[in-house]
Amino acid sequence: MGKAENYELYSVELGSGPGGDMTAKMSKKKAGGGGGKKKEKLENMKKEMEINDHQLSVSELEQKYQTSATKGLKASLAAELLLRDGPNALRPPRGTPEYVKFARQLAGGLQCLMWVAAAICLIAFAIQASEGDLTTDDNLYLAVALIAVVVVTGCFGYYQEFKSTNIIASFKNLVPQQATVIRDGDKFQINADQLVVGDLVEMKGGDRVPADIRILSAQGCKVDNSSLTGESEPQTRSPECTHESPLETRNIAFFSTMCLEGTAQGLVVSTGDRTIIGRIASLASGVENEKTPIAIEIEHFVDIIAGLAILFGATFFVVAMCIGYTFLRAMVFFMAIVVAYVPEGLLATVTVCLSLTAKRLASKNCVVKNLEAVETLGSTSVICSDKTGTLTQNRMTVSHLWFDNHIHTADTTEDQSGQTFDQSSETWRALCRVLTLCNRAAFKSGQDAVPVPKRIVIGDASETALLKFSELTLGNAMGYRDRFPKVCEIPFNSINKFQLSIHTLEDPRDSRHLLVMKGAPERVLERCSSILIKGQELPLDEQWREAFQTAYLSLGGLGERVLGFCQLYLNEKDYPPGYAFDVEAMNFPSSGLCFAGLVSMIDPPRATVPDAVLKCRTAGIRVIMVTGDHPITAKAIAASVGIISEGSETVEDIAARLRMPVDQVNRKDARACVINGMQLKDMDPSELVEALRTHPEMVFARTSPQQKLVIVESCQRLGAIVAVTGDGVNDSPALKKADIGVAMGIAGSDAAKNAADMILLDDNFASIVTGVEQGRLIFDNLKKSIAYTLTKNIPELTPYLIYITVSVPLPLGCITILFIELCTDIFPSVSLAYEKAESDIMHLRPRNPKRDRLVNEPLAAYSYFQIGAIQSFAGFADYFTAMAQEGWFPLLCVGLRPQWEDHHLQDLQDSYGQEWTFGQRLYQQYTCYTVFFISIEMCQIADVLIRKTRRLSVFQQGFFRNKILVIAIVFQVCIGCFLCYCPGMPNIFNFMPIRFQWWLVPMPFGLLIFVYDEIRKLGVRCCPGSWWDQELYY
């Protein structure tokens, strides 16, 4: 969807500061006006942010919330607070009432035009009735039919939206189902939405934080704040107040973030919408929606149709007045012409075509909330994509290992058939032992039958990767750990940057202890004095330090997270069995260790992403990565998936290659650019726009979700149609601002899904590209359907024009037109939605919404004045043939209308002198209606065949590839036969049986249409860019 620029937004910008702490910045963005109430509300939000719970002592907290840090709240007080504050849940944005949704389906551009047409029919019926000139009820039937079409297609569109809403509602998983709470000294579990401020709660690894919580005690607690910052690095939570800002201190855990490991106990200080994330979620409501590109196209088309209808109607109203008709009669002509010009079947065609594409997308894991968003995807020229989980698998995986002075590629498949190193190596065994034992991650129980890569693990991303790799290589990592009981442990922290544990050995005859350590490679190496090479401990001299440094830089340059591992056997004399190891006193060595090797990990790209990015590139779509991750990692992933193409260099790459300072490099020489959040923060909007214009390949790293909004706005300033992916609550403003917001179905928050136009059920970037392809295809096919639908407007209109100007008996009635529009032609026009692409549409550039219109001048001119004109000649040839064979030669028909319609005249003579009563003349008139109807249908068969392609020959596309179209043509012919020859039709719908030869008259005209269009296409293919191409290619 396109989004309006008129909003005022108070934002909380979150990022990552030194030491992994969260930083916050409050700012107000303004684009256009904002109401006083909204401004006041935002100011109130700002005041509410000024909390001091993190700075209060435990006793002050107890007093403030009338609670106990050991026994929790009293149950009676908790019940009162629940009544006062309401449930602990994010209040969903105020939904649109169902009746409003349905009313919208009835009040679009085409719908309004059809309502007007129905009103005109009713007025015409009333005028005829008042004059006593009511020989048929055609206008009344037509009005009822038009209203029925609007209502039925409205119901269809509403049902599609309702069905998508139900799918989206099934994702309600942001709030945890259960929380462990202590009240009146008793510990029990309750639904998380029943928590109130002052509740004493407990969390453990694997739980979602159930509210904003002030930490009172913690043991190795780490949380994932990625829904706030976009960064997946775990954040430590502890009881100490480390910063005056509540958003930066470590003693506050935020609602809906994930507790990765460890345990914690704390007091609830905010619930529901009063939590930090609740306030951020409500800010997205400041961004308003506006029309989608397809809605603009349909409005443009309706303007053209309405303008032409009124022009033709007014012209012939004047002509009718000039040649002597009464005002009321001329007004009836005006209304009839307007109604004849309205393509009544087009609304159903557009709705069904979009619905079919939405259904097709749903089968490919894309749920479309708004039917019009289907086409918007096809117009997309820029995709701003997350990295984690969208471009990558959101599963940290061991990638490389360095031991015995060699870098090895890790095999993470179940069968281990691709392993490139000797698993019997003593060094490998030592490294594997260290990475298995020095690891706090654990598999959830009951997953023995689940493949290792898909098992759920309690622990942070890095330890999960190591545990799964150990499970794949050792076979039973948890059992292996049990053979080396842990007796002491120092958890990882950001100061030491290492994790250490001490274990007893599995051999009961060996009473030594094994000390193992992992952490930042440089920190681990500085604690080592030897290195393990081919099973032997060698002194860690300068040569081995250089080898380590080379390997470390090589792996780090790949954008991978690198960890170092070392070990030390503690002799039994100094550390006998039962020795009391003390982590506070550190009564064991932490230096003089033996370095075992390096292991690097990365969140690998999804297998389908490189091809998807390549498709985007060939389709002229720019893919921009926007991530909270480190610039090196972001750049490496961008290069591996093709966002940064092979051979492209950044300014830093050029400077390194030329060995010159970065500021001396001409930035325009760099095709690629990596901008981090700090740089983005210092750039003004014009600088960002210039960077986007200068560098075709862009990566934004260490960005906050709020900065994503700035990036989207800058792309839109360049005239791009922007699609944005997001999963966090703080992504919702960018999702709403984008022309089409794409939320993640698995990892996405409810706020993101509410703000988005489309949801990826598999969180896969390749699904977006599928959506783009389907969007482009439906635009092409809608163009074909509209061209097919518009063509018959001319043969439906010209009978009225000839009727008024030449005064022949009316060749075609309103009810007959209705059957063409809503019965026989609706199926062929819808069948074009199933047409395959003429060529690889993903090799074309995105359409320019200002230049490449759904209905352009060549389409209108070709449909109306060329193919439509041929159909009109066919209709009149058949009409005059039928009249002549019954005794009414063409010259006699001219000026015959007044006598023909005089129901008092019962002896009107034909060209042979035969006398006709009014009833006989009416029977012949209905026969002419049927003949003209059949003529249009025969020509429309040729028309639907030529509409299969706009450039290629139909022979190249294939006549029978689209089986739905073949069935539709057969159905069209069967309907025509049924209407002509079914008993009772003359009395019900004014259709008459006709002679066989009258079916044959329009066939040469149908052949002419086919040959004429093949010549047009040949010229378009042979002379690209010529006058012929510009004027005749639609």
UniProtKB/Swiss-Prot annotation:
Residues 119-141, 319-330, 803-812, 877-928, 982-996 are lumenal. GO terms for molecular function: ATP binding; ATP hydrolysis activity; magnesium ion binding; P-type potassium:proton transporter activity; potassium ion binding. The catalytic subunit of the gastric H(+)/K(+) ATPase pump which transports H(+) ions in exchange for K(+) ions across the apical membrane of parietal cells. Uses ATP as an energy source to pump H(+) ions to the gastric lumen while transporting K(+) ion from the lumen into the cell. Remarkably generates a million-fold proton gradient across the gastric parietal cell membrane, acidifying the gastric juice down to pH 1. This is Potassium-transporting ATPase alpha chain 1. NCBIfam families: ATPase-IIC_X-K, ATPase_P-type. Expressed in parietal cells (at protein level). It is a multi-pass membrane protein. Mg(2+) binds at D386, T388, D727, D731. InterPro entries: ATPase_P-typ_cation-transptr_C, ATPase_P-typ_cation-transptr_N, ATPase_P-typ_cyto_dom_N, ATPase_P-typ_H/K-transp_N, ATPase_P-typ_P_site, ATPase_P-typ_TM_dom_sf, ATPase_P-typ_transduc_dom_A_sf, Cation_transp_ATPase_P-type. The chain crosses the membrane at residues 98-118, 142-162, 299-318, 331-348, 783-802, 813-833, 854-876, 929-948, 963-981, 997-1017. It is an enzyme of class 7 (translocase). It catalyses: K(+)(out) + ATP + H2O + H(+)(in) = K(+)(in) + ADP + phosphate + 2 H(+)(out). The lineage of its organism: Eukaryota, Metazoa, Chordata, Craniata, Vertebrata. The modification Phosphoserine is found at S27, S462, S600, S839, S953.
